[in-house]
Amino acid sequence: MKTYNVAIVGASGAVGQELIKGLENSFFPIKKFVPLASARSAGKKIRAFNKDYEILETTHEVFEKEEIDIAFFSAGGSVSEEFAISASKTALVIDNTSFFRLNKDVPLVVPEINAQEIFNAPLNIIANPNCSTIQMTQILNPLHLHFKIKSVIVSTYQAVSGAGNKGIESLKNELKTALEHLEKDPAIDLNQVLQAGAFAYPIAFNAIAHIDTFKENGYTKEELKMVHETHKIMGVDFPISATCVRVPVLRSHSESLSIAFEKEFDLKEVYEVLKNAPSVVVCDDPSHNLYPTPLKASHTDSVFIGRLRKDLFDKKTLHGFCVADQLRVGAATNALKIALHYIKNA
């Protein structure tokens, strides 16, 4: 079996760490592993494959020098903008950032939906979609193929780790501060003691309807990503409206979906379609309190869907609630599936 020299740009970050775990657990045919990061992190040690590796600085020359075959980028859009083209001259680049996603020469891939696009990459770069988009499309695509979707309204409840390690630390620190003050005074106004960390407002005991920057039309970039990326991945143009909210959950994103079909549908057929969809787990028995939760979805590679029900007033509309680990399903696992499909079929 052929083996590959693999680099991870942003190896010490939240997604980078999940990529390492995924590479270890998938028995990926690695010949050499090269962790890369900024000059600030270069020289530090990182644990992978039961040994310590020295992090190298990300430069334009390092990919050719280290003879990298596959490079995963998970260090932010500005890093991908600066270095991905250089890396793609000698390596297949799988980019976890938003920088290349809507580039017409870069395929945007969810392998369960459009794996064939992996081999339509003239720049030798493949984009990994937004985490919220990945889990949503894995529900929408099988339903669209069977019923034909007319429109979608989605509201997200996104974990702090979607903002990286700084998001995790903000929640931990703010919870500690809040609980210390609540212990002394249960009626205290937390607005007086909490300060914003990684987000626009304190995230502890809060919900913030603001992910990424606001655009002139009132939507955030995160909300528009879900619209435009879904259209590109699925090859559709039906209306999608998204509202994205950050919640004080450590890991796994949740989404409330309202899906309008072109015709009336049989709910039993919906269950059958989703039960047979790849990477989807139907978790739906309200009589036994069985429905998806972020805690249950964490550290798994499935998209969980439940609370499936017809709209009370519109027989063509389906409601549901889906949850997935955004660091795995929404980033690392999807990127690894792209790489595995590539080496299996190249």
From Swiss-Prot:
> Which InterPro entries does the entry link to?
Asp-semialdehyde_DH_CS, Asp_semialdehyde_DH, Asp_semialdehyde_DH_beta, NAD(P)-bd_dom_sf, Semialdehyde_DH_NAD-bd, Semialdhyde_DH_dimer_dom
Q: Where is substrate bound in this sequence? A: 158, 246
Per UniProt, where does phosphate bind?
101, 225
Keyword tRNA processing appears in the UniProt entry: no
Q: Where does NADP(+) bind?
A: 12-15, 40-41, 161-162, 326
Recorded catalytic reaction(s): these are: L-aspartate 4-semialdehyde + phosphate + NADP(+) = 4-phospho-L-aspartate + NADPH + H(+)
Question: Key word Amino-acid biosynthesis present in the record?
Answer: yes
Molecular function GO labels: aspartate-semialdehyde dehydrogenase activity; NAD binding; NADP binding; protein dimerization activity
- Mention one GO biological process in which this protein takes part, according to its record: lysine biosynthetic process via diaminopimelate
Instruction: Tell me the Pfam families matching this sequence.
Output: Semialdhyde_dh, Semialdhyde_dhC
Q: Which residues form the active site?
A: 131 (acyl-thioester intermediate), 253 (proton acceptor)
The metabolic or biological pathway listed in the UniProt record of this protein is: Amino-acid biosynthesis; L-lysine biosynthesis via DAP pathway; (S)-tetrahydrodipicolinate from L-aspartate: step 2/4; Amino-acid biosynthesis; L-methionine biosynthesis via de novo pathway; L-homoserine from L-aspartate: step 2/3; Amino-acid biosynthesis; L-threonine biosynthesis; L-threonine from L-aspartate: step 2/5
The UniProt keyword set, sorted, is: Amino-acid biosynthesis, Diaminopimelate biosynthesis, Lysine biosynthesis, Methionine biosynthesis, NADP, Oxidoreductase, Threonine biosynthesis
- Its domain of life reads Bacteria
Enzyme Commission designation: 1.2.1.11
Q: Quaternary structure per UniProt?
A: Homodimer.
Task performed by this protein: Catalyzes the NADPH-dependent formation of L-aspartate-semialdehyde (L-ASA) by the reductive dephosphorylation of L-aspartyl-4-phosphate.
Stated family: Belongs to the aspartate-semialdehyde dehydrogenase family.
The UniProt entry, under HAMAP family, shows: ASADH
- What's this protein's name? Aspartate-semialdehyde dehydrogenase
Report the source organism: Helicobacter pylori (strain J99 / ATCC 700824)
Gene that encodes the chain = asd
